[in-house]
């Protein structure tokens, strides 16, 4: 058996009693994040994410067992007049909006400006420099309403979709729009919006730079269970591991 139970499973509309709906890997691992040596082999090296991105993913979802291959740091972005704090790693843009549920025009405007900027910049892969194209930027949102609005705002050929669409894919740059203003406005609740597997997949699509647009109030979301405590804690850890910039300080 080969797989990653820390990412999204196959969707199913069927209800199973007890644990009978678990995948084989989930059933074997139980509460464990990674497979122990006596049960299998954990592939501990990523050839996608630069070493600035991997620590958050590794510590949050893989028991700190995941490391970046040296080849990943041979990919870089050449950004002139960069409006962000860094050229690589995880950048968290703190947004300020209210009453947004399935769409956020504020986040769409920022995404459009970042997208236009990146299309004027360069990507370097093992010493070979080229222009950044639409294929080099993934834009991810939790809700189809936001996805559709972003697609209409960006140039034709943009790679915009939900997390489910992009699992298994990669790009030098990823931009995640969290969309909802707070937990109360999140249509499917924080169990969906802040889901561990979705966060893992969204951030880990990036080879060089992962950008997260998130409203400040989501860090203060009210929790009602131990599971929700874990979800909130992941985002607090994300903030700690990111370069944080307030949206009004972006020079776009």
Stretch-by-stretch model annotation:
Residues 1-252:
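Conserved helicase motor core of SF1/SF2 NTP-dependent helicases
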């Amino acid at each position: 058996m080969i797989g990653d139970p820390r990412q999204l499973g196959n969707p199913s509309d069927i209800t199973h009693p007890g644990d009978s709906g678990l995948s084989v890997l989930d059933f074997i691992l139980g509460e464990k994040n990674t497979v122990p040596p006596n049960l299998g082999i954990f592939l501990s090296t990523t050839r996608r994410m630069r070493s600035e991105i991997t620590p958050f993913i590794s510590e949050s979802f893989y028991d700190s067992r995941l490391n970046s291959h040296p080849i990943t740091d041979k990919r870089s972005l050449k950004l002139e007049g960069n409006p962000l704090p860094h050229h690589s790693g995880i950048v968290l843009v703190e947004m300020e909006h209210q009453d947004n549920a399935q769409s956020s025009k504020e986040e769409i405007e920022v995404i459009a400006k970042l997208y236009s900027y990146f299309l004027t910049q360069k990507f370097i892969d093992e010493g070979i420099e080229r222009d950044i194209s639409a294929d080099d930027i993934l834009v991810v949102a939790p809700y189809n309403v936001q996805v559709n609005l972003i697609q209409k705002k960006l140039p034709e050929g943009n790679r915009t979709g939900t997390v489910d669409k992009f699992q298994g894919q990669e790009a030098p740059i990823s931009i995640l729009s969290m969309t909802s203003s707070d937990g109360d406005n999140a249509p499917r609740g924080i169990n969906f919006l802040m889901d561990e597997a979705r966060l893992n997949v969204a951030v880990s699509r990036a080879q060089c730079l992962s950008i997260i647009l998130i409203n400040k109030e989501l860090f203060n979301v009210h929790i009602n269970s131990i599971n929700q405590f874990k979800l909130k804690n992941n985002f607090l850890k994300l903030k700690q591991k990111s370069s944080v910039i307030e949206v009004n300080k972006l020079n776009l």
